[in-house]
Amino acid sequence: MIRVIQRVVVIVCMVLQAQTALAEGLQEIAVALAYPRKEVIAKIAERKGGDVVSALILERALIRKRADRAQGSPCEQVEDSLKSGCLLLVSANAISDGRFDDLRGIFATLDTRAKNQLFQLVPVALFEKLAALSPTRLISQAETNIALSTESEGFLQDSTKPVVDIEINGQKVSGALDTGASVTLISEQDARQLELTPLHYDAEIGTYYRAGKVKAALYQIKELKIGNTQMRDVVVLVGGQMTLIGLDMISRFDSLYLSPERIAINLSAHELASLEKECRARVFLNSDFMRFNQFLYFIAKVDGKSTIVALDSGYSGDYLATAIMPQGAVRDITSSGVVNDARGAAYEQPYSAEVEVEAGNKTIRMPAIFSGTRKLPAPYVLGWRGFSHYHLVYNVKSARACLI
């Protein structure tokens, strides 16, 4: 069987700095955002106002919902060594939620040091551009159920795809609901037929499965509808050859259920509670400060060794991708070796081996694919085919997620 891998994971490369270039307090927070270990969180929480910062980190990581939702800046009582980091987290949340009007108020509270640290992570031009925009508004939100089929345009496929209908400014396009995409991306082809407002800011996107960069640009959509969720004044990137609904947009739903048979958005309270009772393994969010790079992951044992496995519904080609050549791997002769992503088609030489994945007392044997041309976000990535064994339940509103 010829198998074509079609995949892009979005990373926005907007002058991001290495963690080692950050001030000490920011380094601690950056480490905790990547992998929130108890000892790191505890060290932050011990300091003045550290409980506020740790609560922001834990909520971002999908570990615990913040209890304190008082009006005003949550960072007012935070000590100086953590204050800049706290304000950066709040700024990032505002950008991710589309609360661009809040950015102006946050910026007014920054001292010179905090501004300098902010602009290490976000270019001044981008911050000013976003702060001047109208905030994204949620117009309506209701439950949506999408049954997925292996039939496409009269032909049978060997698996379903997480494709949903999207309405942009009244015109319909299709896009992948992609848990492996940091941000939402509209393809150049789709953008040409839509009435989008250019924001005159250029960026770059990169791919995990073909290491490289593609030029993109910032646009604002007047009206966006995904299922029964309707929003106005939504900021997206335009570039490349694939339209993807990324984690920034997914995080604006109340909840999400994702399996090869069905996609459900904004589930009823009863169904969501019922699904959460079946949870086998916790799912967390890894992110940088500004959420320009972020991915969902779970902890599993692969061939008996504990490791991180990212969740990527947009990676449709395989069950499991690996950044490490598996023991006993052989050339994968079932693959065409063709990879399609935002930069077009390319050829790779994949190798495969059967591995044992154990998560939440559920053990599955599945093929793991290795290719030297890929730059993965984690040691292993569960692709769309792997979702047949592990379904995602994402309770966005309560800041928790799991696999069933």
Question: Over which residues does each language-model region extend?
Answer:
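Pepsin/retropepsin-fold aspartyl endopeptidases
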Residues: 22-404
